[in-house]
């Protein structure tokens, strides 16, 4: 009877997820009875995500300081999980707007899968329980595999198979790590004191190796090295609004789970994270240098961006993950703007190849300026909010070096600055081709004023948040652990 009361009591506190789950069941019915080209799945999905966003925002207004532990510790609802749920919901809304702007005629199954990913990420953001992490991650992963394969083309099937193979491998490695942790700690909740005490009896090296195994599934979703091989092919062939969503939402929540693992302090994971950061930065940046396809370049740069974000997750006596969370907040408009730009450029040129963008910025100067601002934000140059994000991450390295009295972190600072400098070359290739290079025998392009205007809103927001960062910084400070 006591267990039943616990379940009923806990269920009252996840109303947004119940709304989302009910909506997912309803959209299955809508898709089953509507024509293939019906707009009702899109309209219903948009309304459902709006309701979910508002309910997730206002339902948890009076959360206690330590959050709410639900279902006997399976779930943890706190300000941090709420922050990430809001970011993922906003990215879903941007995905739906992106589909509308560029007149993507997706089948209803696409929206069903997208809502499943949203539900999985929602649960993933509010747990410290190994079992919930694994199940939620599998819901996200399986839905993602199907999304990539939705285009009935050979390249999409090949990319989806590669995505599936790497995903299944990383999930198996992760499950093996979880089983080892369960054998050592005799519980599946890594935030419980009993688990931390039991783990402490083992040698640090063994714990670090097992932690790396557990992190495999999360690193796969974050698109961090060495679990990154699926990225370029999937980014190239997947529809732009879908990959725009997948490039942000799983990465953001994956970083949150890594931060929760670091914050629980059952092991010193800095050595493991440093290896991942170094690999992600060097592989992502060097591979991006040689790309001629914009979406493949954004894929490789996303690997490097994962490395920069993980810098903010490194553990120190003063760790609060402020740099990582602020970076993720700014990464939302930057990455969504970048993929909107990519889609608009493809519409105008008929290709994702950067050489085909020659002269587009000369014909439409506002489009060229938007490209400059968005690419500067990805590099981390002023006057864009990307500069603030990079600055806070690099500041956290300096503080870490002072607190830990280790030159390794100062080496990481130099390495990070060098990689940021390298990224200037491949990011600014886009405005270079648009504004500097001239195209001979150039066809007449139909410049879409409305789409350029929407893109301009993203660009202006990147500059405004640089000039007035208080909104973002205060929001992040409220949700720190």
Report residues per predicted region.
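Alpha-helical transmembrane segments of multi-pass membrane proteins predominantly involved
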Residues: 1-481
């Amino acid at each position: 009877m006591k267990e039943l009361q616990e379940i009923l009591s806990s269920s009252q506190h996840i109303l947004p997820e119940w709304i989302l789950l009910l909506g997912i069941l309803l959209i299955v019915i809508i898709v089953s009875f509507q024509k293939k080209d019906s707009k009702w799945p899109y309209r219903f999905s948009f309304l459902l995500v709006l309701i979910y966003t508002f309910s997730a925002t206002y339902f948890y207004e009076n959360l206690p300081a330590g959050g709410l532990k639900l279902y006997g510790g399976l779930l943890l609802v706190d300000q941090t999980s709420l922050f990430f749920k809001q970011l993922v919901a906003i990215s879903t809304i941007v995905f739906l707007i992106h589909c509308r702007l560029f007149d993507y005629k997706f089948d209803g199954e696409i929206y069903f899968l997208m809502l499943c990913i949203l539900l999985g990420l929602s649960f993933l953001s509010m747990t410290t329980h190994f079992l919930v992490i694994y199940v939620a991650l599998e819901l996200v992963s399986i839905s993602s595999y199907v999304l990539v394969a939705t285009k009935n083309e050979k390249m999409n099937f090949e990319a989806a198979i590669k995505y599936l193979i790497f995903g299944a491998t990383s999930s198996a490695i992760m499950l093996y790590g979880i089983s080892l942790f369960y054998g050592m700690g005799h519980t599946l909740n890594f935030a419980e004191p009993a688990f931390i005490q039991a783990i402490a009896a083992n040698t640090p090296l063994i714990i670090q190796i097992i932690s790396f195994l557990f992190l495999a599934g999360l690193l796969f979703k974050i698109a961090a090295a060495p679990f990154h091989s699926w990225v370029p092919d999937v980014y190239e062939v997947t529809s732009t609004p879908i990959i725009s969503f997948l490039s942000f939402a799983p990465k953001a929540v994956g970083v949150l789970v890594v931060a929760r693992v670091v914050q629980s302090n059952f092991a010193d994971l800095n050595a493991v994270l440093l290896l991942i950061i170094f690999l992600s930065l060097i592989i992502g940046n060097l591979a991006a240098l040689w790309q001629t396809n914009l979406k493949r370049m954004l894929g490789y740069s996303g690997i490097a961006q994962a490395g920069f974000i993980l810098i903010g997750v490194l553990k120190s006596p003063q760790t609060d993950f402020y740099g990582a969370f602020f970076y993720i907040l700014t990464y939302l408009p930057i990455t969504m703007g970048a993929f909107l730009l990519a889609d608009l450029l493809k519409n105008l040129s008929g290709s994702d190849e950067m050489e085909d963008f020659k002269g587009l910025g000369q014909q439409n100067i506002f489009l060229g300026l938007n490209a400059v601002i968005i690419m500067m934000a990805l590099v981390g140059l002023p006057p864009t909010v990307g500069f603030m994000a990079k600055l806070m991450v690099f500041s956290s390295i300096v503080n870490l070096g002072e607190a830990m009295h280790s030159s390794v972190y100062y080496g990481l600072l130099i390495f990070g600055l060098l990689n940021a400098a390298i990224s200037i070359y491949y990011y600014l290739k886009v405005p270079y081709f648009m504004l500097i290079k001239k195209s001979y025998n150039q066809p007449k392009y139909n410049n879409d004023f409305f789409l350029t205007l929407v893109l301009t809103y993203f660009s202006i927001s990147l500059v405004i948040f640089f000039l007035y960062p208080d909104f973002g910084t205060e929001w992040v400070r409220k949700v720190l652990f």
